[in-house]
From Swiss-Prot:
The lineage of its organism: Bacteria, Pseudomonadati, Aquificota, Aquificia, Aquificales. Keywords: GTP-binding, Hydrolase, Metal-binding, Nucleotide-binding, One-carbon metabolism, Zinc. Zn(2+) binds at residues 73, 76, 144. One of its GO terms (molecular function) is GTP binding. This is GTP cyclohydrolase 1. SUPFAM superfamilies: Tetrahydrobiopterin biosynthesis enzymes-like. It comes from Hydrogenobaculum sp. (strain Y04AAS1). Homomer. Its EC number is 3.5.4.16. Signal peptide: none annotated. One of its GO terms (cellular component) is cytoplasm. The gene is folE.
């Protein structure tokens, strides 16, 4: 649960700390806007991971690719954004495809690093579906590298997390990587 008042006070202190007049017309409502944004994010992080067991005989790879997302780098509080690809091989359970999209959104809507985001998505799919295997790939641009530091806009950082057949069977891994590139 978030503490809206602490967020408001923290943003006021931050703005004053960088020399802004917190009574200025364009800024005076910013602390409340930021708190409201984080409240909205918190609401989106909760969802029901509905399973469908009536398709228990399906045993080929299921992929949802090019899932757009945005997150916040926990080191600099700057956005990173891109797309995620999720695949799994069912073991008697499948989920509504939107649940994979919601999983990406839910895990991304908090201060995060891309490596952990990739692992958390794979963890949830593994826990909820108990599949034969899971593959997650995330491609993202980090504004903390584009706007500051090395100032390298347009880069793409790629992370992956593989479980089960995706890790142990080279053909499954190759099929996954080939399909997400098509």
């Amino acid at each position: 649960m978030i503490d809206k008042e602490k967020i408001i006070e923290g943003i006021k202190l931050f703005l004053e700390g960088i020399g802004e007049d917190i009574t200025r017309e364009g800024i005076k409502e910013t602390p409340e806007r930021v708190a409201k944004m984080w409240e909205e994010f918190e609401k989106e992080r909760s969802f029901d991971f509905k399973l469908f067991e009536e398709y228990s005989n399906y045993s080929e790879m299921i992929i949802v690719k090019d899932i757009p997302f945005y997150s916040m780098c926990e080191h600099h509080l700057l956005p990173f954004f891109g797309k995620a690809h999720i695949a799994y091989i069912p073991n008697k359970k499948i989920c509504g495809l939107s649940k994979l999209v919601r999983t990406v959104r839910a895990m991304a809507l908090k201060p995060q690093v891309q490596e952990r985001l990739t692992e958390e998505i794979a963890d949830i799919v593994q826990k909820e579906l108990e599949p034969m295997g899971v593959g997650v790939v995330i491609e993202a641009e980090h504004l903390c590298m584009s706007m500051r530091g090395v100032r390298s806009p347009g880069h793409c950082t790629v992370t992956s997390s593989l479980r089960g057949n995706f890790l142990s069977d080279i053909r499954t891994k190759e099929e996954f990587f080939k399909l997400i590139r098509q």
